[in-house]
Every structure is written in C-alpha cells, then in structure tokens.
Amino acid sequence: MRASTYHLNTLKEAPAEAEVASHRLMTRAGMIRKLAGGIYTYMPLGLKVIRKIEAIVRAEMDAAGAIELLMPVVQPAELWQESGRWEQYGAELLRIKDRHQRDFVLQPTSEEVITDIARNEIHSYRQLPLNFYHIQTKFRDERRPRFGLMRGREFTMKDAYSFDRDEAGAQQSYDKMYDAYMRIFERLGLQFRAVAADTGSIGGSRSHEFQVIADTGEDLLVYNPDSQYAANIELAEAPALLAERAAATQPLEAVPTPGAAKCADVAKLLGLPLERTLKSIVLATEPEPGKVQVWLLLLRGDHELNEIKAGKLPGLAGFRFATEDEIVAHFGCKPGYLGPIGTALPVRVVADRTVANMADFVCGANREDFHYQGANWGRDLPEPELVADLRNVVEGDPAPDGAGRLAIQRGIEVGHVFFLGTKYSEALKATFLDETGKPALLQMGCYGIGITRIAGAAIEQNHDERGIIWPRAIAPFEVVICPVGWGKNETVRNESVKLYDALRARGVDVILDDRDARPGVMFAEWELIGVPLRVTVGERGLNDGVVELQARRESTAAKIPAGSALEQVLAKLETL
C-alpha cells in the first residue's frame, strides 16, 4: 500500500468528549468517526485492525473445532419471551416493531436464537458435541455510551455456543474454549489475565472473564502472585475470621457527632481508627406485591459493599436501595446516623463477617448528630440475624487458596466464557434423544469475545504521549517506510520502492509513505497511528550506506546497512 493512494486523515485535536486514551487516539489517528452516541464508522485504518483481530479469533475458533455460521441481528420477541429475558434484560435491550406491529429486538446476544437452532437441528446424541460460532454486530442501548469503542451501543462480537449430551462433555467443551481464548489473547500480543467471574444476566453455574490489564480498566481483578488464583472482585471471597471476638471493655455511650455523617468523619472526630466504625447500608425487597421488606447490611467503616454477593443472599435477590422515606420510617432518622440499635420498625440485619467479630464498635444512634460508642453484640443488641461475606476484598487480604496475600489490579473485560448447563435448553425445550431413545436436555456453554472492544483495550494498554503503540499482530500496518526527499532524490525513491517490494514479497503488511511530506510531520503522524516499525530512507544515510530502523516502542533509531535492510527488518519484526 502507498500512502498517496490510501485514506489517511489524522487530527491534531481530540474531541472534547473523549475521556480515555483509546477514544482520543483512535479519533485523532483517523480510525473511527462518530455517527451518534456510541455508534461509530470504522475508517480504513480502524477496520484493518478489526479485521486482523477477527482473523486471529476465527483461526483459533476453527482450530478448536467450532463451526462458523451467521445469526441475524434482528430477532423476534417471541424467543426472548420464551426464555424469560424479554422482561429480565432491562432497558439495554432495544425493542422495535415492524410495520405489522410485531415485536423484535436488536440482538445484544444470541443465546435464544442458537438454542432455537439447536432444538430444530440437533435430534440425536450421535450429532454431539457441537460448537457453533459467529462474528456479528451487536446492539446494547447503553444509558451513557462513553469511552469510544470501550462502551459503545453498536459493536462487533464473536459468540460461540457449545452443545453436549452431559455435564462432563460440556465441561470438556468449556475447557477447550478456555484454552482457545488463552491462545487468542497470547497471539494478540496483549497482557491479560483470566479470572473467575460472576455469571450476571447470561446465567449459568461457572464463568471466567478475560481481562486486558490497563490502569483505566473499570474492573478490579484480584489475584494471588504466589499461585494461580485470580477472580473479578465481584466474586473474590473475603477471608473468614478465625480469631474469637474480643470481650467488651467499654460501656455503651451515645456521643455527639455533629455533621459527621460518614464513617471517616466520625472516626476523625472521635480519634478512632476507621476500622472501629460500622457502616450501615439499607436495602429493600418486595417479597410480595405491595409488601416492602427493609434490610440493614453492616460493614466495617473501611470496607465497601459487594452488591453481587449481597444479591445472592437468601431473600435479597433483586434488591434495591431503600428510599429516604423508607429509611426514616424504619430508623426514625435520615441517612448518616443509622445503626442497628433501637430501630423504629423491625428490620432484617445482616452483618459482614468482620462486623460480627467486632467489639466496642461505633455505630449510628438513629438520631441525627449522634453515634453510639462502645457497642457490643449480645450485650447492647442481639447477635446479627445473618452473618455473610458482604464486602469487597482489599489488597493484602489472605488469599482464599491459602497460598499468600491478595493483590489487585485494573482490567478491561474483552472476553467471557460461561458454563450454562440447561438454563436455556430447559427454557426453550431443546432436547435430543440419548442412547436409550429418551429425550434429554442439551448441556450448553457460551463464549464471547468483544472484537471491537479489543481494539480499544489494546490502545489503553499500549500508548504513550505520542500516540498508539500497536502490538504487531493487530497493527494496521507492520512496517512504514518513510523516504526523506521522495520528490527530489531518485536514489531515495528507488531504494524505498526496492525495500517496499521486497517486504511485500515476504508477506509483510507494509505501507510506503510517498506523499513527500516533511520528515517531522511524517514521523509524528506514523507515531500517532502506531505502526510498530519504521524504516527511514534518506540521501545522507544512503551516502553512508545505511538506513534507519526504529521500533515504535523504542526511543532511538538504529542505523543498519542498506544492503541488508530486508533481513534486518524481518529479524526485528520477529522480536515485536
């Protein structure tokens, strides 16, 4: 490819709305252009990156025995109603009507469609196992699309779905896809971590996320540097306390805490460590229509509530945060001074493990500008109704596998594998005949990769103040040749074209910048775009028999013999 016949349109400034590096740099590099909120056109450079990602994913899916098909973007509401997700999925599911007033959705995922295919296509155990996949456009009506390709409304995903006769076979399919994902992300050239994760709205009994490591990631990844343990913070279990609760040493006392509505303020005012305070979080459920049950969840003041864990407790599925009116009615006080002692109306109390082990703690007195000091379980209030793991783990907690201490880093989710079991086959009655001729439910797994999101995540992990630094495997071009004096020096032109042709003949994805731009402008543009390797061909260097070779990640260029430039470029590429 020659730059003079390619579409390159870089920008000096990023859009004001761009909050993260990938959004800024992809826009400035001319890779994407915004059409509407969360909806982008992939310009030629951006599309090249997407196609390279797709090619790697497709190759590994094929190698793992998955079979490609293509399911529609528009899906009938009946399938979603049959699975129960028409009501469950929420506002992110874009519902539309056709001219006959029939309901459809723009697919955010394809479990319903693939299960419908399976129940019509798979009849016998002899057809199993099977694994279908497709790479298709998705749409999720995000409330606040942001971060460019990181959280768009329209995007491209690879979805795979496995079908097996029993759980053992389904586990083998899951493991095979897990291994394929490991190979995919290794080939993409990204630093990543596979972590155990919650199954969320997809459902199922087991799942792993594949997270690209990046400081801007929205997810917190918990891992043990001394073992293989790794989990999303949503799933990471906090350690059970083995030590016995200390004996009470203080009397219960109501102390004034004017204006101290947060645990940190109370601790500072009373001159106590934050971990001596109690944090009160009020939730509500509706076990019956029109009947509200209020819950008080108690955490240590320095800990944060894990909503995923809370939602899995008996009676708390589908909880919401209580309204201020509900809080005042049950506690006789506005938020900021709430506690478990002397509530106005009965509430169900759930204590985190650490809280159940506390003595002489500080909690709200259910009276504005007052807290209790020296509170103790069993003496000043009943033992908690339920003790559970409610909190997010913190750095330095003992690892659940007992092999060390936990560390935490940020990540961007780009892939997810789920062991579904019979969740969808049961809902949609997808069965096959086993060896005895009896119908049995298909065992399923589903496996997603965010194709377009990978592009954004790769940039979040690989960029500097000058622009993008693409991993070689997904760079729009592997090599750019930058002639200095293209329009003035025939030798420069000839040597540049010679190297260009030689690299193309060896299968290298190379672009020749034949636009005769000034060197500084040319170099800055290609650094912004992020091509991994640049070869500079200039009159002065050729007079000395050399050209310059510089990797995008390196700060200085190396002079290499012009006569062996091809071999040196190929050798350098192998190191990237």
Swiss-Prot record:
Catalysed reactions listed for this entry: tRNA(Pro) + L-proline + ATP = L-prolyl-tRNA(Pro) + AMP + diphosphate
Q: Which Gene3D superfamilies match?
A: Anticodon-binding domain (3.40.50.800), Bira Bifunctional Protein, Domain 2 (3.30.930.10), YbaK/aminoacyl-tRNA synthetase-associated domain (3.90.960.10)
Q: Which GO terms describe its cellular component?
A: cytosol
* Predominant place of localization: cytoplasm
Entry-linked InterPro entries: aa-tRNA-synt_IIb, aa-tRNA-synth_II, aa-tRNA-synth_II/BPL/LPL, Anticodon-bd, Anticodon-bd_dom_sf, Pro-tRNA-ligase_IIa, Pro-tRNA-synth_IIa_bac-type, Pro-tRNA-Synthase_IIa_type1
Q: Name one GO molecular function term.
A: proline-tRNA ligase activity
From the Swiss-Prot or TrEMBL record, state where the protein is found.
Cytoplasm
Could you say which EC number(s) this protein's record lists?
6.1.1.15
In terms of NCBIfam families, this protein maps to: PRK09194.1, proS_fam_II
| Similarity-based family | Belongs to the class-II aminoacyl-tRNA synthetase family. ProS type 1 subfamily.
Assembly notes: Homodimer.
Know the name of this protein?
Proline--tRNA ligase
Organism of provenance: Bordetella petrii (strain ATCC BAA-461 / DSM 12804 / CCUG 43448)
